[in-house]
Amino acid sequence: MPLKKSELYASIWASCDELRGGMDASQYKDYVLVLLFVKYVSDKYVGQKNPLIVIPPGGSFAEMVTLKGQKDIGDGMNKIIARLAEANELKGVIDVADFNDEDKLGKGKEMQDRLSNLVAIFENPGLDFSRNRAEGDDLLGDAYEYLMRHFATESGKSKGQFYTPAEVSRVMAKVIGIGAAKSADTTIYDPTCGSSSLLLKAADEAQVKISVYGQEMDNATAALARMNMILHDNPSAVIWKDNSLSSPHWKEKDGRLKAFDYVVANPPFSTKAWSNGFDPEHDLYGRFEDGIPPQKNGDYAFLLHILRSMKSTGKGAVILPHGVLFRGGTEGEIRRNIIRKGYIKGIIGLPPNLFYGTGIPACIIVLDKENAAGRTGIFMVNASQGFMKDGNKNRLRHQDLHKIVDVFTRQLESSKYARMVSLAEIEANDYNLNIPRYIDNSAEEDVQDIAAHLLGGIPECDIAGLHAYWQVFPSLRLKLFALARPGYVEMKVGAAQVKAVVFEHPEFKAYHARSMDLFEAWKKAHRPLLAGVGLSKKKLQQPPKK
């Protein structure tokens, strides 16, 4: 019997209640997620031959169960985790939380009860991951991200940097075209990977398993990323803990930065101390040839690092605040140089308040080196109005996500939403990329007709605004409206009768019949395909070609 996500989420989230009080959310996530990891790998790999994760004697969740009610439960849990970490080269990854910390977990009986209750929650038979569905199922990974999303919400603005909303991650994955990747040699990199949620979503978009690289400077967050990769059945992914700007880890043998096929990133906004630990004027990797960013704002430092980390055929997407689009000074010079090189393929303006670490509106800058030489314009999308409220944050809906991706990938121009802006127009605007300068999505003013209010009647211009309908049903207009006086019409039928008049009109009936014929033809042609839709992740059988 497969696990239900709702039951899994409820059971795991209940464990957080055992830890509240002694620490804030940014700390108790370390405990809950480590236990989730230990329970999962114990259920999944214990007793297996050649497992991805080795479960050593005295290093499984079963040993934790035997500690319930014992005075030394905290110390015992630490030792179990240490054995598991040592057997799998996971030191510094899964042993970041101290289960014997009296300041966070209480003293004596309080710690004993709290940890015993916590283990009991994970001991629930309903959380038997050995009975999980097929190999590679993301049920556990989804639960992991569910927890991280809630931790980010509770942690507040200063602690939510480790998570990129899944919808935004999917947009980035799709607009860089990683779905076209067919080889396991394809590489993807995130220099500020956080918990790796963005990196995972991007890698999952590929048709095959690709090579995944990440770097994260925060120790606890880097540990989250490594565990997240394992829980998503991606144990070969390599996450390095260090500062990507001052100490980039991924390099070629000759010392140059390693170049990747795809790069995605959601770096911290407007980092003030970005140059700590190295001298940008004498950068060993040539990242700042287009200019050195301001000392107290690192937005362009990350962008330049990303560009340097892309192959000559590389694609990328990075989330940055809107300020990078229009700020002047040295940032303006860097922006001009990057635009002239043709590296920017497009810009997607996102709704405000999407991210847990900040309420600042952000954009996705889409990068493309492969087609840079022939670039004649930058495709801009103003998606700032498409979202739903989700608690105290905003969130992209499925229709918002699909609209952004469809419009961007097909380069479809849409009034007040998207257009291709020529490089000549951008140059004429002094390389200012502020989206409202090129796409006006302000609401049209509601013009009131005073004469209609005073004398009655419906302005003919309002009726003419429905011209798309009158083209299909030309005589229906005459059936509904009569001239009242020059420029104004009046209804020939009462409001209650409008629907019946429309439905009984010959032109509407003929249109409806044609529509149904087309639908029936489509249904007949696609029935074999639709009949194959089920819960299986296997590729659907296509209908036989005629």
Report residues per predicted region.
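Conserved S-adenosyl-L-methionine
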Residues: 158-265, 270-291, 300-301, 320-323, ...
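Short helix/loop capping segments that flank catalytic or ligand/cofactor-binding pockets
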Residues: 130, 201, 272, 389-390, ...
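Short, well-ordered loop/turn and helix-capping segments at boundaries between secondary-structure elements
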Residues: 37, 231, 269, 312, ...
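Non-catalytic, mostly N-terminal accessory regions of nucleic-acid modification and defense proteins
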Residues: 1-180, 244-249, 349-352, 375-376, ...
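Conserved Class I SAM-dependent methyltransferase catalytic core
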Residues: 7, 11-14, 18, 27-37, ...
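Conserved NTP-handling cores and scaffolds of large molecular machines
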Residues: 23, 39-45, 147, 151, ...
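Conserved P-loop NTPase
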Residues: 363-364, 368-405
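Hydrophobic alpha-helical scaffolding
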Residues: 108, 133, 214-218, 262, ...
